[in-house]
Amino acid sequence: MATSHRVAKLVASSLQTPVNPITGARVAQYEREDPLKALAAAEAILEDEEEEKVAQPAGASADLNTSFSGVDEHAPISYEDFVNFPDIHHSNEEYFKKVEELKAAHIETMAKLEKMYQDKLHLKEVQPVVIREDSLSDSSRSVSEKNSYHPVSLMTSFSEPDLGQSSSLYVSSSEEELPNLEKEYPRKNRMMTYAKELINNMWTDFCVEDYIRCKDTGFHAAEKRRKKRKEWVPTITVPEPFQMMIREQKKKEESMKSKSDIEMVHKALKKQEEDPEYKKKFRANPVPASVFLPLYHDLVKQKEERRRSLKEKSKEALLASQKPFKFIAREEQKRAAREKQLRDFLKYKKKTNRFKARPIPRSTYGSTTNDKLKEEELYRNLRTQLRAQEHLQNSSPLPCRSACGCRNPRCPEQAVKLKCKHKVRCPTPDFEDLPERYQKHLSEHKSPKLLTVCKPFDLHASPHASIKREKILADIEADEENLKETRWPYLSPRRKSPVRCAGVNPVPCNCNPPVPTVSSRGREQAVRKSEKERMREYQRELEEREEKLKKRPLLFERVAQKNARMAAEKHYSNTLKALGISDEFVSKKGQSGKVLEYFNNQETKSVTEDKESFNEEEKIEERENGEENYFIDTNSQDSYKEKDEANEESEEEKSVEESH
């Protein structure tokens, strides 16, 4: 880790963009000097240094740490001034070998230095200081950092895997320049050998004493080298456009071409394509002999024949699959049956002898029978009148209640109560006028029977409007009754408060309800029995109606019967007319009149039955709509009243008979 960190640190310090020594600004890629020219300048400088080394070897070895190539240490030196990167980058293995050799040489020098230091201490008779490996490695690292030259260490950094980003930076910046330089300068191998020699000769003539010398000597040597520095020669950079700029310019030129040029090019291309077509010559083949044959007419005939045959086949298939409607076949059968019946009837009529009526006896035209009938009616009326008078004379009034014997009371108190009870409070009625009076009373107080009223049809559309109208009217009435007046005298409720009668006493809440008597219980039982009987009768009537409806023929059957009857009557009347017999003569003399009357009666009966069934159906629907309970209540009340009236009448008749 320490070695890799050290190498990375060296590379990071060496990766600096070159700076213009005059202006101090960083130099762009296209403004930099040519690396080959920089190498040539470096060679010249090295030659000068070698000459100086011959003259002053001590000064050159002492200043190795500050300036290796004779350039001022304060001036930024770019790696392109000394090394051509593509000449060295391809040999990583050689580079690592050289680095290992340098490391071994460095270790040897440090060992020598340690030995010299111990010898010096031994001479001075001083105990040696224990030096740890860490401090030794640090000292060796510092010495190596002093001795290492940044441009040379740059060559190692680009082959290391940890420094891929830094290498990519340089490669991307100089990948357009290096191929051109390799083409222009074939002296690549010579420069490569020079770089290798430079690396090999780095540790030659190395001496530790050069580092122990005074700083003055290094200062004087630096001043001398500053005087010998070459001046910076400005170079003119020729700007070259980028490939993308050239590409965009070509696109613009192509787009700037006029449409006429494009059309001309297209026309020229079309001409080139059409010229060989025009040059071709057409030569028609001879007409074949099959064309002159009348094949078309034969084909048309075959099509017509095929079409006709298909049409006939389809018609036959349709006729075979065709079936008449069922009702048509049924009507035809009925018609045939009727015709057969008429034929049989006419044959039977022809065979039978004609009817001849006997003459009416003369006794029927006499007056004896009528006189006898009238006399019998008179005798009957006289008998009824006489019987009525006898009944009236023999009738007597009801015996007095006091005359009837009563039970002997056990206690005297009960006897007093019974005497008080049997006191006559009203005079005896006139029994001759009682029936008429009762009839009047019953006719006045008898509750009329409620008749069923047909309701209109409840359609889904009509009730909405009527319900809304009723609600609006009810709201108006409620507002008129409850809301306050808006004008003087501002009476709070519009409806009049009900005036309470003075004679009406409030019924106390704590009073016990009346105890039912024996007569009330009997009445309730009678009402229940009558209701049950009425319900049974009602159920019986419903069942009878349902049976009638089930047994009754359907409407179309009745219509068919009626039509058949009318047709038979018409046929019969036509035959009579054809024979010269009138209908009146037949109705008077023959049995045909009775037959016709029977048919007419049957028709009237059927019509009445239809009407009755229709009315019964309507009544059933009304009862199903919710009137059954009301109907039962009213009928039960009527039956109960009728029973009471019948009982009263029977009691009155008994009283009249007893009085007579």
From Swiss-Prot:
Keyword set includes Chaperone: no
Main localisation: cytoplasm
Glycyl lysine isopeptide (Lys-Gly) (interchain with G-Cter in SUMO2) cross-link, chain position(s): 468, 484
Stretches with biased composition (Acidic residues): 645-660
Location of this chain's protein in the cell: Cytoplasm, Cytoskeleton, Cilium basal body; Cell projection, Cilium; Cytoplasm, Cytoskeleton, Microtubule organizing center, Centrosome, Centriole
Coiled coil: 93-120, 296-320, 522-552
GO biological process terms held by the UniProt record: cilium assembly; cilium organization; positive regulation of protein acetylation; visual perception
Alphabetical list of Pfam families matching this protein: FAM161A_B
UniProt GO cellular component terms: astral microtubule; centriole; centrosome; ciliary basal body; cytosol; Golgi apparatus; mitotic spindle; mitotic spindle pole
Region annotated Required for interaction with CFAP418, chain positions: 341-525
Basic and acidic residues bias spans: 606-623
Tissue specificity field: Isoform 1 and isoform 3 are widely expressed with highest levels in retina and testis, with isoform 1 being the most abundant in all tissues tested.
GO molecular function per UniProt: identical protein binding; microtubule binding
Disease: Retinitis pigmentosa 28: A retinal dystrophy belonging to the group of pigmentary retinopathies. Retinitis pigmentosa is characterized by retinal pigment deposits visible on fundus examination and primary loss of rod photoreceptor cells followed by secondary loss of cone photoreceptors. Patients typically have night vision blindness and loss of midperipheral visual field. As their condition progresses, they lose their far peripheral visual field and eventually central vision as well.
Family stated for the protein in its record: Belongs to the FAM161 family.
Self-association and partners: Interacts (via central region) with CFAP418 (via N-terminus); the interaction is direct. Interacts (via C-terminus) with microtubules. Interacts with LCA5. Interacts with CEP290. Interacts with SDCCAG8. Interacts with FAM161B. Interacts with POC1B. Interacts with CEP78. Forms a microtubule-associated complex with POC5, CETN2 and POC1B. Interacts with CCDC15.
Record's protein name: Protein FAM161A
Organism: Homo sapiens (Human)
Gene field: FAM161A
